[in-house]
Amino acid sequence: MKLSDWINRKRHNGGYGIQSPSSFFFITQVLKERLPYYSYPILDQAVGGNRAKKRHFRELFRITNYQQPANCISVGSATAACTMILAKPSVAHYAVTPTGLTAGRQSLLNEKGCHIVDSTEQLRTIIDKVGTIGMLYINTIDGADTLIRAALPHTNKESVIVVDGINRSKTAKLWWQQLVDDSATVITYDFYNYGLLLFDKDRIKQHYTLKR
């Protein structure tokens, strides 16, 4: 990471330098929340892996719990699908081409009523079915840019899109920057490993970069 990037992330770390009350609350009380959730043990078991991976998906859990989306769609990650369905089990869930679909994760998704589809071509059908996206998680898989472009017209002020792997490659960085600059997105967050896109047109367009 370049020194200038590190300084920028350091300046914003912990919510400092953020003037928007809603963004400050989101960062300090949601993203950096330290109190345990009752679902964490089940979540950690479903996620597996090291501490960093568990922290990453605990953040996704808290974001989902905070946003209270009307529906949840994950593309390219069974772990993300499990995370969102544990955080908000009462709405429709769709898992598109979920990589890492172990027997345990599939059992959890089936138990909670998640609709699992094996082709990204079906994402458009799912979006048409739900009408407006509640929460969409998408990994930087091949064709992800096209999928998100198809999703953007189906967002509103309550929608959130989580883009994983935004700094994974030069191509991913360029693609992420294009999304940040897009007129459809309003509030965007760069958490280094992943980014968030929000669409509330009542707010001023703003981008935040935080140290991970």
Where are these predicted regions, by residue range?
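A short alpha-helical cap/connector motif
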Residues: 1-157, 167-212
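Short beta-strand/loop segment that forms part of the nucleotide-sugar
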Residues: 162-164
